[in-house]
Amino acid sequence: MAVTRIVCVAGARPNYMKIKPVMDALERHGADVVLVHTGQHYDESMNDVFFRDLGIRPPDRYLGAGSGTHAQQTGRVMAAFEPLLDELSPDAVVVVGDINSTLACALVTAKAGPLLAHVEAGLRSRDWSMPEEVNRVATDRVSDYLLAPSPDAAANLRAEGYREDQVHVVGNVMIDTLLANLERARASDVLDRYGLTRGRYGLVTLHRPANVDDPDALRGLLKALGGIAGRCPLLLPVHPRAAERLAAIGVPAGIRLVPAAGYLDFIALQDGARVVLTDSGGVQEETTALGVPCVTLRENTERPVTVREGTNVLAGTDPDRITATVNRVLDDPPAPRCPALWDGRASERIARVLLEGGTARTRARPTDLAPGATSGPA
């Protein structure tokens, strides 16, 4: 085994579902795994409950980054992670997804020297106004291992000029967690607690700044949701960043606000829904794996495979278009289908790549050229 100590970084809810199976697979193969939690999401309902639901052990180190502007948050994580990385001296660091913690820890790792692996590499929305897109692109650029969830993500990386030895199509690690916990989720009593009947309600999630921070955009979305609720009652677990804004604007009849759900309850709510309306990338993937129709309230998606090979439909943010799209989906739901390699084994593939791929001294690094390539005019 070339790599023995690996730091795995988690910072926000989407990271938790992705890092757990990777940690488990690495430890099954004998790696010394250190879990670092940056504290980017620090609300108890969005943090501790996911560790409990997923059975993640308490973090070995906690950075306590908290909230703030993008620069403040990224800077705090970098400042806290740098001395920790020097202390731990790992062979590799694994970052997941596209949040500020991902980029912060990637930059620190790249300058410190350990190998860097990016889980979910190659996802592209082609929307440079999204902070997550900037984080994705910058993290990929400094990573040694680009662990792509699907062939289209790998194609993006190849088109951007990455070496073939960096790019690995491993499948969707988030689906590893979903499949491992689906039986437990289906045993949840959350539908009974909310008086819901399977297949007789819609589920809504809203959290992206473009949707919830702009009062006009949020009013437009609520107008569309209010019209849809007349046909299909809607349940909206309230993300902390959206709670105050929803309260200030007011929610139409037929939309029921409930507290943010834990992981198992939320999977159960998705699994039982007639349709899911979301601006979340992860929910697009989970609904595809569950075979549940999904309408994405965005103009683009970094996960187009869920549209081409899944149950996802892009509706944009125009209220009339949203209403028309949801009505069409309710009348004629997309057939359940799931992309290749979303089979619950992505984390095992990731472990093999990391543990068999060499060390920082033996591998080519991110800016090394492929054999035969030139850096400029002869």
Question: Where in the sequence are the language-model features?
Answer:
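A donor-sugar binding/catalytic signature common to diverse glycosyltransferases
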Residues: 95-96, 107, 118, 146, ...
